[in-house]
């Protein structure tokens, strides 16, 4: 998300947890300001503490507590870089009111109530500025599930041309789930004839006990 920027003005994570991904992106991109939202009150407080422990001035970060999809804390603010590892296939209300929400309304369908993956993706794209880059970790299902998700996927690829790269990751690299995942990279400034880059990194790991690990050499090869 830092490519093309000598220095990011800001970086945003809508499901920031304790803030580790935010801090990493901000560090690599030399971001001036850090923004995030976290639903869990305890984790929200950890994120704020984490910022201060890493030397981020209080005036240079804004972490909000709340449900990102139900109560967006950042209105129509847009950011240079948007990163997130949202909860996989989480449930959300998919209430009728969201059909008139600018984050979701243009896609033609709402993400299903039992799989909010595309709700998070559309939310993130809404907050991405025209020259920015977004990266989101998601389950493989977002690549092929049909119905409403198929409509949204077609909107993002065919109508908007926002999908820049898809990186297939190994299974079992995240604690708590063994499902294969991917990183989706989005840009709003792509040219009409730009191709989508596909990277199969499913074999790029080292097995450590019951967990698969991405080592620096694997990350370097992917990049």
Predicted feature residues:
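A conserved structural/catalytic subdomain of Rossmann-like adenosyl-cofactor enzymes
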Residues: 72, 76-223
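General small-molecule cofactor/ligand-binding pocket signal
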Residues: 35, 62-64, 167, 199
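Conserved acidic E/D residue at the C-terminus of a beta-strand in Rossmann-like folds
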Residues: 38
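S-adenosyl-L-methionine
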Residues: 46-76
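Short, surface-exposed basic-aromatic patches at helix termini and helix-loop junctions that form
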Residues: 26-29, 53-55, 154-160
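Short, solvent-exposed loop/turn segments at the edges of secondary structure
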Residues: 29, 58, 177-179
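Class I S-adenosyl-L-methionine
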Residues: 1-33, 43-46
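A generic structural signal for alpha->beta connector loops
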Residues: 8, 31, 58-60, 131, ...
């Amino acid at each position: 998300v830092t490519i093309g920027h000598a220095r990011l003005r800001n970086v945003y994570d809508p499901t920031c947890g304790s803030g580790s991904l935010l801090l990493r992106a901000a560090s690599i991109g030399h971001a001036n300001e850090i923004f995030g939202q976290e639903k869990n009150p305890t984790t929200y407080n950890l994120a704020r503490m984490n910022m201060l422990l890493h030397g981020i001035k209080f005036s240079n970060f804004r972490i909000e507590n709340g449900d990102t999809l139900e109560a967006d804390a950042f209105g129509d603010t847009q950011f240079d870089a948007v990163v997130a590892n949202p909860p996989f296939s989480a449930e959300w209300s998919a209430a009728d009111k969201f059909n008139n929400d600018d984050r979701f309304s243009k896609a033609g369908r709402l993400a299903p109530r039992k799989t909010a993956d595309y709700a998070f993706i559309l939310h993130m794209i809404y907050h991405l500025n025209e020259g920015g880059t977004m990266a989101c970790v998601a389950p493989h299902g977002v690549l092929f599930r049909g119905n409403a998700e198929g409509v949204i996927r077609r909107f993002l690829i065919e109508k908007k041309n926002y999908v820049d790269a898809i990186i297939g990751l190994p299974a079992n690299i995240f604690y708590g789930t063994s499902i294969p995942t991917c990183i989706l990279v989005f840009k709003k400034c792509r040219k009409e004839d730009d191709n989508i880059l596909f990277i199969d990194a499913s074999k790029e790991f080292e097995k450590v006990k019951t967990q698969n690990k991405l080592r620096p050499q694997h990350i370097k090869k992917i990049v």
